């Protein structure tokens, strides 16, 4: 029996056109296994990585992965995330980005968000609230799906 070896996942860097592309939605029953595998590998290999989007690993799909609890191994995935509401309160924080190594920028973001998204099994989650650093990570990754990166501006 042959074991298929996968190539190491490469992060797309500043200047790659996929980073400025608005990603396409995942459609029902679409196979996203390879994308989920790639996102998981990136987060697992870098303890400082708190989130990554599908286009950062070369896929034009609306999928993100992130660590809901920094320092713990758990990885959360969101498919087709949509921000439905944000809090009026904002805070500033110096953000970094895997696609812009060594660059950081102070970015102001809402402290809370309400999202609709699907999990990787296709189950819909509506009106889910996120606050604090978790909300910040999710917003940063959704920016990537929309072809934007605040760190690059």
PLM features: what roles do these ranges have?
Residues 1-153:
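Positively charged
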